[in-house]
UniProtKB/Swiss-Prot annotation:
One of its GO terms (biological process) is protein refolding. Belongs to the HSP33 family. SUPFAM superfamilies: Hsp33 domain (SSF64397), HSP33 redox switch-like (SSF118352). It is found in: Cytoplasm. It comes from Oceanobacillus iheyensis (strain DSM 14371 / CIP 107618 / JCM 11309 / KCTC 3954 / HTE831). Redox regulated molecular chaperone. Protects both thermally unfolding and oxidatively damaged proteins from irreversible aggregation. Plays an important role in the bacterial defense system toward oxidative stress. GO terms for molecular function: protein folding chaperone; unfolded protein binding. Keywords: Chaperone, Cytoplasm, Disulfide bond, Redox-active center, Zinc. Under oxidizing conditions two disulfide bonds are formed involving the reactive cysteines. Under reducing conditions zinc is bound to the reactive cysteines and the protein is inactive. This is 33 kDa chaperonin.
Length: 289
């Protein structure tokens, strides 16, 4: 089944909700990044959440998220647009630990419990919207929940889960974001908190094969939920040889000349998809300004 995301409202429009099935998307990220199990879970959660954040945008807007903890993973970076295209990478993809005391992948140990979550939105304006909040747990979902409450003053619940097979491929992945709309009564916030506490962990729902529709129905009940849109999501990279050529130009003529003399060419690799682009001596000469 292809990955997809749904947009919905609940409680007479006082809550907006997003839910996503991202298994194939995360498997493609894992394949391109060659991530081990714990790294796959951390990267997968970040990409899953970022895909839903991208679905909140319009037109040509885009969003980039970065999880920078003090753990061995280093940086986790993901970006998404309003059309369901998402990509991501992690600095150290071969991080893997034994299961934690709850029997789950130890994402917090890999990410670290100190550091920052940063969000950059390109909304087509002169300046980007940027927000940054501290990591509160390293579990990623809780960290983005805190980001929304603190940076955007939007009471939210964020959940993302990734299940990994013994051979490191992705068994299942998905998540949800639910947000209380501005002006909603305090009782709506309290009711949402109770609803979140009442449902099983997102990883359990994913393991049971629950669809995005079923996840939100379990959360709000069928009568209170209105689904407005269903859209596909996929791992798609924006890299190209022309884009990487611009990056090489930015290094300056001296660096380009060194590539020509020492390496008789150059090979550039995209961080996000690991696609390799080769530049001959002649192509490098043409890039000199």
């Amino acid at each position: 089944m292809k990955d997809y995301l749904i947009k919905a409202t609940a409680n007479n429009g006082k809550i907006r909700a997003y839910a996503v099935q991202s298994t194939n998307t995360i498997e493609e990220a894992r394949r391109r990044q060659d991530t081990f199990a714990t790294a796959s879970a951390a990267l997968g959660r970040t990409i899953t959440i970022t895909a839903m954040m991208g679905a909140m945008l319009k037109g040509d807007d885009s969003i980039t998220t970065k999880v920078m903890g003090n753990g061995p993973l280093g940086a986790i970076v993901a970006d998404a647009d309003a059309d369901g295209h998402v990509r991501g990478y992690v600095t150290n993809p071969h991080v893997d630990f034994d299961l934690n005391d709850k029997g789950k992948l130890d994402v917090a140990r890999a990410v670290g419990t100190e550091g920052n979550i940063s969000v950059i939105k390109d909304l087509g304006l002169k300046d980007f919207f940027t927000g940054e909040t501290p990591i509160v747990s390293g579990e990623i979902s809780e960290d983005f929940t805190y980001y929304y409450a603190t940076s955007e003053q939007l009471p939210s619940a964020v959940g993302a889960g990734v299940l990994v097979n013994p051979d490191h491929t992705i068994l299942a992945a998905g998540g949800f974001i639910v947000q209380v709309m501005p002006g909603a009564e305090e009782e709506v916030i309290n009711e949402l908190e109770d609803q979140i506490q009442a449902i099983p962990a997102i990883s359990s729902l994913i393991r049971e094969g629950k669809s995005p529709e079923e996840i939100l129905t379990q959360l709000f009940g069928e009568e209170c939920l209105t689904i407005h849109e269903k859209m596909p999501i996929e791992f798609r990279c924006k890299c190209s040889k022309d884009r990487l050529a611009q990056a090489i130009i930015g290094l300056g003529n001296d660096e380009i000349q060194a590539m020509i003399e020492e390496d008789q060419g150059a090979e550039a690799t995209c961080h996000f998809c690991n696609e390799k682009y080769h530049f001959t001596e002649e192509e490098l000469e043409d890039l000199k300004q």
